[in-house]
Amino acid sequence: PLPPSLPSLPAWRRCRASTCSQGCCLAAVGSRRCTTPPRSPHECASRATSAGSASTPRRSSSCSRPPSIRTTLKLGWAAGKVFEEEGIKAIVIGKDTRISGYMLETALQSGIIAAGMDVRLVGPMPTPAVSYLASSFKNQAGVVISASHNSYEDNGIKFFGDDGKKISDELEERIEKKLSEEIVVVSAKKLGKAARISDASGRYIEFCKSCLQRNINFNQLKIVLDVANGAAYDVAPKVFKELGAEIIVLSNQPDGTNINKNCGSTDIKLLQKEVIKNKADFGIAFDGDGDRLIFVDENAIELNGDDILYVLARDKFENQITLGSKGIVGTIMTNKGLEISLTKMGVDLIRTDVGDRHVLQKLEELNWDLGGEQSGHIISLDSSNSGDAIIAAIKFLEAYVCSDLPMKDLLNPLVKYPQILVNLKTDNPEKILKSKSFKKLVN
């Protein structure tokens, strides 16, 4: 039985000001904000956790950790209470393949059940799958236990509303406020119930396949998939196989500790090697939670989010597929060459801060449907209400097949400008960004 109350714990807050170059939120506990910059484009700083998630901070690279069991249990209870006020009847819980995910899943569902809310378990599933499942059921929210592209030692928790979108700042703050209260377990009669959604992966696979908009298949394609020993290890191969592609699968033996290890979208060397070895048309690398991807062409050349956005925008423009107001949303990291190439096609580019959350907000504000990040987060609101790597891959391959062009020719008009990423360690980023010397340097 759960204790009737637990000591008050420090509140969690996602730092809304600081993000690494891959869009990962730098976590903080209480009101302390993390100001440590990322060490590299693909590696978050000492306090980094998964994007949009709650977590305890990493104390050092040798002593990193997921949220504590007590924190997770209380977070589940607090979220259950707040979602109940919103009319939510159940919460779908998914996770990636980290070993700590099983521990956190148990603690989280215990807290939710103690709040009187039902739980629906789906096991290891891509983050976008949980988003889809939450929105496909009536009055059900979603929770994902993942640290995205980080190593297995880290973990985090992120919430989705019944619309499948990440919860608002206002809802987040209400959960945080509820954390300051003592846990009060509902009566035995009102306790929530836990059940497993047995056909969760099948539902999501069929949804992904339905996003192929034209009457084509991938029968002529040979594709190497690197599923990063992560959340997409089971569903991604099935999707592309059922769409007709010949597939070779890499990094699909998760053991709890090998997620993102020398594989996936943050390390594509093995994928490049296997594409050449197998004479494949493409290689596709997913990240640990399946919301980000990187392509590799037949010559093992990397195609990042900017390349993917260009191909998708060109397909929409030339084939007169709905593109809202003929514009796409990128970020401050988006290559200038993409902006110039889009302008020549009559397609506008609007930039936001780094982070798929910012991209999604701008898309909704402008009523556009396509946006993304250089890191491989691609959002297609005409098919999904969140960034989904599998759907992005389907759309990219669809555009390629329908173009009837070699990839080199399809991308030929896109001339990317050289980019250099420099991380500056500072405790006052606003002062630097507003300084005359910095503006002069950038301009």
PLM features per residue range, with description:
Residues 5-25, 31-40, 44-66:
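Low-acidity, Ser/Thr- and Arg-rich intrinsically disordered low-complexity segments
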Residues 59-60, 64-110, 114-115, 194-221, ...:
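An N-terminal, well-structured beta->alpha segment
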Residues 129, 173-206, 210, 298-372, ...:
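Proline/glycine-rich low-complexity loops and linkers
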Residues 139-154, 275-297, 301-302, 347-388:
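Glycine-rich phosphate-binding loop
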Residues 155-276:
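Gly/Ser/Thr-enriched, mixed-charge loops and adjacent short helices
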